[in-house]
Regions:
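Short helical segment in ABC ATPase nucleotide-binding domains corresponding to the A-loop/adjacent helical element
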Residues: 6-14, 25
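Conserved ABC ATPase "signature" region
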Residues: 22-40
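Conserved ABC ATPase signature
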Residues: 45-49, 53
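Conserved catalytic motifs of ABC-family nucleotide-binding domains
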Residues: 66
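Catalytic Walker B motif of ABC-type/P-loop ATPase nucleotide-binding domains
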Residues: 70-73
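Helix N-cap at the start of a conserved alpha-helix in ABC-type nucleotide-binding domains
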Residues: 81-83
């Protein structure tokens, strides 16, 4: 809570690059712009911004070093469905724009359906199922089905398929 939005994104640049201060500032602005954070929020602290904005700051920090891989651990936890969808779309667009491989750990089936391509289902530390989101509804894996179809909407979708 002691580092501003701007400082949060600058942190990996300070730690792992020899960029000039001007170059760092330009990169910070670039990253924050890409996650739709306006300059007036740069000096704010985490306690002064919404949960959705905090997630976007974390994503901006994650892309600051222009990684090949983006790892997201429960990127939608604590967010309302509308904001979660915004975060999913943001991750999806950044993945394409920066040509990164993105790995998302989530319990949110909406996210899996929204942005998943290859899906790995793990239960109690064991790989249970691997496939595409298109194959999920027709999976014969009982543990996967129990997890997914606890939601009545998905259960109705399965009956219809």
């Amino acid at each position: 809570d002691s580092i501003s939005v701007e400082g949060n994104v600058r942190f990996p640049l300070d730690m792992f690059t020899s960029m000039t201060s001007k170059e760092k500032q330009k990169r910070v602005e670039f990253c924050l712009d890409h996650v739709n954070i306006e300059q007036k929020a740069f000096k704010l602290f985490p306690s002064e911004i919404s949960g959705g904005m905090q997630k976007r700051v974390a994503i901006a920090r994650a892309i600051a070093l222009n990684p090949k891989y983006l790892f997201c651990d429960e990127p939608n936890s604590g967010l309302d469905p509308e904001t979660a969808t915004v975060i999913d779309q943001l991750i999806q667009s950044l993945t394409k724009e920066f040509q990164m491989t993105t790995i998302i750990n989530t319990h949110d089936m909406n996210s899996v359906i929204e942005i998943g391509e290859s899906v790995l289902f793990i239960s109690k530390g064991e790989k249970e199922w691997v496939g595409t989101k298109a194959e999920i509804l027709n999976s014969g894996n009982s543990k996967l089905n129990d997890f997914i179809f606890v939601n009545k909407l998905y259960a109705q979708m399965k009956k219809g398929s």
